[in-house]
Every structure is written in structure tokens, then in C-alpha cells.
Amino acid sequence: MASTACFLHHHAPSPATSNLSRTRSATNRDEQQQEHSARLQSPEADCATENDALLSRRLALTILIGGAALGSRVSAADAAYGESANVFGKPKTNTDFQTVTGDGFKILIPSKWNPSKEVEFPGQVLRYEDNFDTTSNVGVMVNPTDKKSIKDYGSPEQFLSQVDYLLGKQAYFGKTISEGGFEPNAVRTANILETSTPVVGGKDYYSIHVLTRTADGDEGGKHLLITATVSDGKLYICKAQAGDKRWFKGAKKFVESAASSFSAA
């Protein structure tokens, strides 16, 4: 019996041991409940994590696209019409003018101007005019000459006096009183606004800008740009013009470009 009592003495739980065991059991139950709760909540947590990742990717893509747009110099409108975008890689051309080549000369003509059969001056070989306003036109005259250079005609002013038919003829020759800045008995005036003597391709040229006015004119006058040179025994003259009112409404660009582009071979 002594040995049995000893065995029971060693294995019977004490009150402290029972309390510790109950504490551990309660702790294990709490941990299991927390783990179970975590398992129940894990689908929502995984979904939130996935949404956050998707939002981050979208935000990064938006920033990338925005940066590319800011770094590009091509506007949406330009790209739509293929201007600045230059979609096909072809060099841009000036569609406002067309190159016209004649016998011994070349000139740029406004694209919206059409050929005209009207012969206004001797030796005229070309004439184009604006469809909406025939006052805006350009003509080329070629006549034989014994001069070797345009300078053989004298100064630009002296040359103009020898081809004054380019300024137009006075239709009325009766007596008039001084009115509107005109001299007595004169119904037409011509004022030289500018002259220059450029050298193009080794040839001397005269460039003369004249403003003509008539007493009954409704355009406020006409701007005449005359370009002339001598080549191979021929006098080449280009005369481009526009009414004064239209001159300042956009015609200046076309008239000046046509006159300055004229050249003889």
C-alpha cells in the first residue's frame, strides 16, 4: 500500500496544476477562435488586396499616358488632320501656290487663280487672275531687246518711264479741276513706293512697287509689282497687281510672292 500511495501522490494533480491546465485550455480555445475568425475574414481581405493592386496598376498606366501626352508636341487637332503629326512622313508642301514654267521663265502662281485669255500688253505670254476679283492678276511679257542687261535701260525709274504702258492708259483726256489730290486735267496718278536691284542667278533684276490711283476708282488705287530682267536678247517683265483695299485684306501675300518668285533662265 505504501508504494501505491506513493504512486498516487506523485500523479494526483494539485489545485495549482489544475488552474494552469484550465488557463492553457482557455488560451488554446481563444487562439483557435481567432484563427477561425481570420479564416472567415480572409476572402474579403484578399479581395481588398487585389483591388488595391488593380488600382495601383491603373494609376501607374494613367500617369504613363499623361506623361506621354505632355511630352508630345503634336496636338490632337493637328494629329487628326495629319499636319504636325506628319503621319505619312512626307515633307510638307506649300499648297497656296503652283509653279508655272514658260518659255525661258518660271513663276509661282496662287493656286486659286485661273488662266486668262485676255491680252493686256504687247508680248504677253501668260496671264492669271483671281476668280473672285479680276483686279488681282499677274502677267508675263516677253519682248525682243538690243540691251545686254536691265541696267542698260538706266535706273529703275528711267526703265519704268520706258514701259509706262504697264501702268494703264488714261481713259479721259478732257479738262478737269484739281480734286482728290489730282493735278488739274489729270485723272490718274502713279507713285513709286519702292525699288530694288537684286541679282538672281547672276542676272540683274529691277523690282518696282507702284501705287496707281484713278479719279473714279473704287479700290483706293492699285498696287503694281513689276519685276524685269534681260536674258538672251529678250526683255522679261512680270507684273502682279491687286486693289488697295484687297491688298491689305490678304492679297499682298499672293502678289508679292508671285512677283518675287519670277525668274528668267
From Swiss-Prot:
Keywords of the record: Chloroplast, Membrane, Photosynthesis, Photosystem II, Plastid, Thylakoid, Transit peptide
Subcellular location per the Swiss-Prot or TrEMBL entry: Plastid, Chloroplast thylakoid membrane
Primary location: plastid
Presequence range in chain numbering: 1-69
GO cellular component: chloroplast thylakoid membrane; extrinsic component of membrane; photosystem II oxygen evolving complex
GO MF term list: calcium ion binding
Cited InterPro entries: Mog1/PsbP_a/b/a-sand, PsbP_C
Ranges annotated as biased composition (Polar residues): 15-26
Region (Disordered): 11-45
Entry similarity comment: Belongs to the PsbP family.
The name this protein goes by in its record: Oxygen-evolving enhancer protein 2, chloroplastic
Species assigned in the record: Narcissus pseudonarcissus
